[in-house]
Amino acid sequence: MPITQNTRLVHVDSPLGEDVLLLQGMEGSEELGRLFHYELDLTSEDRAIRFDQLLGKPMSLGLELPSGGKRYFHGIACSCRQLTGHGQFAGYRVSLRPWFWLLTRTSDCRIFQNKTVPDIIKQVFRDLGFSDFEDSLSASYREWEYCVQYRETSFDFVSRLMEQEGIYYYFRHEKDRHVLVLADAYGAHGTAPDYASVPFYPPDQQMRERDHFYDWQLAREVQSGSLALNDYDFLRPRASLEVRSSVPRNHSNGDHPLYDYPGEYLQSSDGEHYARTRIEAIHSQFERVQLRGRARGLGAGHLFKLTGYDRADQNREYLVVVARYQIRQEAYESGQADLAEPFLSELDCMDASQAFRPLPLTPMPIVRGPQTAVVVGPDGEEIWTDQYGRVKVHFHWDRHDQSNENSSCWIRVSQAWAGKNWGAIQLPRIGQEVIVSFLEGDPDRPIITGRVYNAEQAVPYKLPANATQSGMKSRSSKEGSSANFNEIRMEDKKGAEQLFIHAEKNQDIEVENDETHWVGHDRSKTIDNDETVRVKHDRSERVDNHESISIGVNRTEEVGNNEKITIGVNRTERVGSNETITIGANRTEKVGANEDITIASHRTEDVGGNESIAIGGNRDE
């Protein structure tokens, strides 16, 4: 006669069909903010079950309740093992875990921008094809400008974000699914049907007509009394962002402080939230009550009130934080031992009036050294920056972005010199490769510390032929070609040293006091168009040897007052055509020796008044 589970305390529902797998026993655990795990010991008359029919597929257990209803344990079959059988039966062991556990099997590098943590969590779930979750959050959460999943599983990424924000979860089990419930407060919890209160019966009490607890333990542990956090905002460099939160306790040594930096916030209100949730997470461990008994309907996330205990202060409402189960069913074949207790549960509970928060156990990924990235921006732009000289980049590991102005947050750029409205600035341009470091190794906090050349963005001078050359060479924007640039270049080749300066258009030099030029040999200066020189005070010019001035067309020289010319030896002046001299007043001309005047043609002399000529000797004309 085929075996059946119709009359059993626990019914197995598997992809293999009715009564193919039967439960011998189960050990399981659940915890707020952690994954559940149910280990099923199963038996079957089929000794050759193909694991592919089970692995990765949903299974459930239906546990009969005293009221006639059922409680379900639903999960994904994540591992299967065949055991040595007994008689006509084969043994199997199957582990059930939540769908959330499957996120431990996938990892990514991904950037989220301008989203709250609940929005990020839901997007991760949906992108991976999961929809069995429920938002029971009551708090509001800040928008993260920039949040990175970096070389970590999607489970770790979501878990650490929840732990940071003080969000946790538990699972609601149904026959055909289990639902992840996001929680952050008392209002996210409720009582199980028929288990709003559960009595305590001492072990020696004989009449136990309903589900109950028979063992009670209370534990307390010294915790830190306060937590202070701090951070820095470059937009408010002098602002104090330190925050503090405390949970006072009456016992000795209950006030030891914790301090941490950075707190990963820019607004004090966000810091206060983080400080409060972290100290609440610590004090979630302060007091625990452990109850053992037979409360088949209670699991992690349920509320209930304990009744009947001899300490009145302990008859209060509790929140189940951890639940451990042990189920044993009677043997399907004679000769196998039966256990007296078909169901036992052990619950770790806390006072429901106290806030529960998950401890931050999931490690933050660390970027272990600098990376390179490519500067990006909108189509049609060559330089894309904001008022602080920040730029955006595409990381080589990011397979989701479009390499545009939305690829990253604005990232600060290290410069050679940075003062208050003074210093050096060279903005990385779109397409250039930059070196990116991360503050404290945090992928959420990038900073550009350098730039490098690559095969597309090559060096400005041909190497290694010009290895002795160094300098700076820019590129005109927009749409500048290799012929459009400003440049300062130094040639250090022995015997051919040179400092070369090229201005693509204008060059303006301002000297607020003295300027001195020294040229050890020749100087050549060519101006392709006009030159204007203005000296607002005196000008002295000295030529120790010859001076030659050649003027191709006209020359006009104007002296506002006196002009004095002293010639140490001879002077020769030649006018190729006419010369006109106009003297507004008197003229005195003195020749210390002879004067010869030769007029090849006519001469006209007109004296408007008297003329006096005194000749000491002869005169020949």
Please tell me what each predicted stretch does.
Residues 81-96, 326-347, 383-388, 456-465:
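Short, solvent-exposed secondary-structure boundary/capping segments
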Residues 69, 85-86, 115-134, 139, ...:
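Extended, domain-scale alpha-helical bundle/helix-rich regions
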